[in-house]
Amino acid sequence: SGIMQVIVFSLIPFLCWVIKYKKQDNFFKWIGLYKPVKLVSNKKATIAMVIYFAVFILSYIISKEVSSNFENMGAVGIVPSLIVCFIQNGLSEEILFRGFIGKRLIAKFGKVSGILMQAVLFGFMHIALALAMNLPINISLMVSYFIIPTIAGWMLGYIDEKIYNGSIIPS
C-alpha cells in the first residue's frame, strides 16, 4: 500500500506536468527531486532541523493515527512505525505538498506566502483525513489534526526553499 500511495500522490503532479509544463523543465526538477544545494550556514540549517524534529516528535506523541497500527508490537513496532512515517507518508506528502502544490504556490505568490499556503492546506488535509476516518474531533485534538501538521508543513517548506534551494529531498 505504501508504493501505491507514492504512485497516486505522484500521478497528480505528473499529469499536470505532462499537460502544462513538460517543455519547461524536467519532471524531477519541477517537483523538487534533485540534489539539494545548501544556501545558509550549518548553524541555521541545524536550528531549523532541530525545530522540525521537535514538532515531529510532538506530533508523534500526540497522534494515534500511525502509532495505533503498531501499539501492540511494543518496542519492535518502532521501526515499522518510523518506516511508515518517513517513507510511505513522508515521501508521498513531500511530492504532493512541498513538491507540487508548494512549488506552484511559491511561483504564483512568492516564497513566504506560498510556503504558508501549502502548510495550511497540509493542515486542512489532516483534518479531512481525521473526518474521513471518523476520528473524534474536539478542540484539543485540533492541535493534533491541524496545527501540528501546519507547523510541520511550514517548517518543511522553509527547509526546502530557504535552506536547500527548493529541493524536497532534505524534508
Where in the sequence are the language-model features?
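Interfacial helix-capping/hinge residues at the ends of transmembrane alpha-helices
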Residues: F28, R98, G102, G153-G157
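Membrane-interface helix/loop boundary segments of multi-pass membrane proteins
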Residues: S92-A119, D160-G166
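Hydrophobic core segments of transmembrane alpha-helices in multi-pass, intramembrane catalytic enzymes
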Residues: V8-I12, P80-C85, Y145-A152
